[in-house]
């Protein structure tokens, strides 16, 4: 152990004594809980920095300075110790490492590989924390959070750069990820797709105007194709039970009997890309293939009535039953109801319930005939007739995908709530904040990491990413995980798993947050 390491150890012991005095000294007897908690947090961060610095110093101490052999058989002599900075959650720390060199061959730093350091200075933990914040918050807000909680200054440029680098392995991660165990899957395999516009920065114009003209915008939108695949258990419903749920009417006795708890998607995977419909659906088909098999009894493809998307869904998933998202179909009924009765008419809801029941009962052909006849009746205003004709035409074109009575009887989903929620939460809530403009590459990187987070793959992906990076940088396997981290985790887990652990320490368990509002909070069990 060098004198530097010994000095750091002495400083750590002094700081620990200060910590004890901070919570038990005379001043602590007059302090508030808030003062002690805040002070402890800052002092523990400082102590963590010293402990991590000691770790680096001791690893450098034990690192041999004897000449090393390269993979090619060349010998490199010890040249000097060289410093690199390490930006950790505790702040900026120096790492001194022995550097080995031979003229004409270059140099190597074995300690970098042993510590599994990346190419830049940011620690993996700091990267993962900032990126996890970044996939849900604007980048400058992420920087504010890091500054407020950890006292760190991480620029938006650094956050964006780290996300771009760490998103590079997402595609290869999902390519190697095994399909779920069939025993954990349900019998209905469901695919969904929809598009959502993302505001992009324009290509640099030769002479940007000082003031925009009427109707001009500073950016343009490009469609992000959002896809999802999951399995779900069959849930038989009646048209009436769906109407009762959708319009929050008092359910009939038969409807109550046929209203079990809602089935939930199993192993849902979502994805979004600006590479186009074909690229998105090709990838979706690749995801679907290993999940299909004898355990799957039904295959369902859900999307809205956008004809180009429907054609592609039929092309890429020919063995799936294409279903028009019922919510989209019902929106056309709402437009007719508003045109005929007005938004404030007391009978509008009753009219909607009546025609919704007809649609769900697979009587859409009758609805089409009624609307077409009304569209020719001159007693209705021109705008009313136009809306009737528009809806009749929409239903006529989508009639092959609107056999809802059969779908409900088989227990199939009839609404693309998963993908609608993904478009809103996954894309819009992050990419369409006020004044936000993206480069295509920047938003692709964000959406990749956001998919990893939303799919519940965050920790597993970053382990994969670190292994891939290590092979690229050092051409060797990632170091085996030492028991240190596992020991810390197990010690913490063993404390948490004891039923009396919290109560014996006078602690109440922290309540889990509620599920995010989304598909499962829809009034319609679809």
Placement of each model-derived feature along the sequence:
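Catalytic center-proximal scaffold of phosphoryl-transfer enzymes
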Residues: 1-57, 97-526
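An N-terminal low-complexity regulatory-tail signal and nearby short nucleic-acid-interaction modules
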Residues: 56-119
């Amino acid at each position: 152990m060098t004198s530097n390491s010994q000095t750091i150890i002495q400083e750590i012991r002094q700081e620990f004594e200060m910590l004890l005095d901070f919570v038990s000294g005379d001043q602590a007897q007059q302090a508030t809980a808030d003062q002690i908690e805040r002070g402890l947090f800052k002092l523990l961060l400082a102590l963590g920095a010293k402990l991590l610095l000691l770790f680096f110093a001791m690893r450098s101490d034990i690192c041999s300075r004897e000449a090393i052999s390269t993979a090619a058989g060349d010998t490199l002599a010890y040249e000097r110790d060289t410093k690199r900075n390490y930006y950790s959650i505790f702040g900026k720390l120096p790492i001194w490492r022995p550097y080995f060199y031979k003229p004409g061959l270059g140099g190597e730093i074995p300690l970098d590989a042993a510590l599994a350091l990346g190419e830049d200075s940011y620690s993996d933990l700091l990267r993962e924390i900032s990126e996890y914040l970044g996939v849900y918050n604007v980048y400058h807000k992420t920087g504010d959070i890091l500054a407020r909680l950890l006292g760190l200054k991480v620029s938006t440029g650094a956050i964006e750069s780290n996300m771009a680098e760490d998103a590079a392995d997402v595609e290869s991660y999902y390519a190697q990820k095994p399909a779920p165990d069939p025993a954990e899957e349900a019998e209905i395999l469901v695919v969904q797709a929809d598009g959502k516009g993302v505001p992009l920065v324009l290509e640099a114009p030769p002479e940007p105007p000082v003031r925009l003209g009427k109707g001009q915008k500073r950016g343009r939108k490009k469609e992000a194709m959002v896809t999802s695949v999951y399995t779900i258990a069959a849930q038989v419903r009646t048209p009436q039970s769906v109407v009762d749920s959708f319009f929050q009417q008092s359910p009939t006795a038969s409807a109550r009997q046929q209203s079990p708890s809602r089935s939930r998607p199993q192993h849902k995977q979502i994805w979004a890309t600006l590479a186009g419909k074909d690229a998105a659906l090709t990838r979706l088909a690749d995801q679907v293939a290993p999940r299909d098999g004898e355990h799957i009894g039904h295959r369902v493809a859900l999307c809205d009535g956008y004809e180009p998307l429907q054609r592609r869904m039929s092309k890429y998933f020919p063995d799936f039953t294409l279903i028009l998202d019922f919510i989209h179909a019902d929106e056309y009924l709402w437009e007719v109801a508003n045109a005929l009765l007005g938004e404030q008419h007391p009978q509008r809801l009753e009219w909607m319930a009546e025609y919704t029941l007809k649609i769900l009962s697979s009587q859409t052909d009758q609805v089409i005939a009624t609307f077409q006849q009304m569209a020719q009746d001159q007693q209705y205003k021109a705008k009313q007739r136009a809306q009737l004709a528009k809806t009749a035409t929409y239903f006529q074109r989508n009639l092959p995908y609107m056999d809802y009575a059969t779908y409900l009887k088989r227990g199939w989903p009839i609404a693309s709530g998963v993908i609608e929620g993904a478009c809103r939460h996954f894309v819009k809530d992050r990419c369409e904040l006020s004044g936000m403009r993206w480069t295509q590459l920047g938003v692709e990187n964000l959406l990749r990491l956001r998919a990893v987070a939303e799919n519940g793959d965050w920790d597993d992906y970053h382990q994969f990413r670190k292994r891939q990076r290590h092979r690229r940088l050092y051409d060797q396997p990632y170091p085996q995980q030492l028991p240190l981290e596992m020991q810390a985790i197990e010690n913490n887990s063993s404390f948490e798993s004891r039923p009396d652990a919290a109560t014996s320490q006078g602690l109440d368990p922290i309540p889990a947050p509620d599920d995010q509002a989304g598909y499962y909070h829809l009034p319609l069990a679809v």
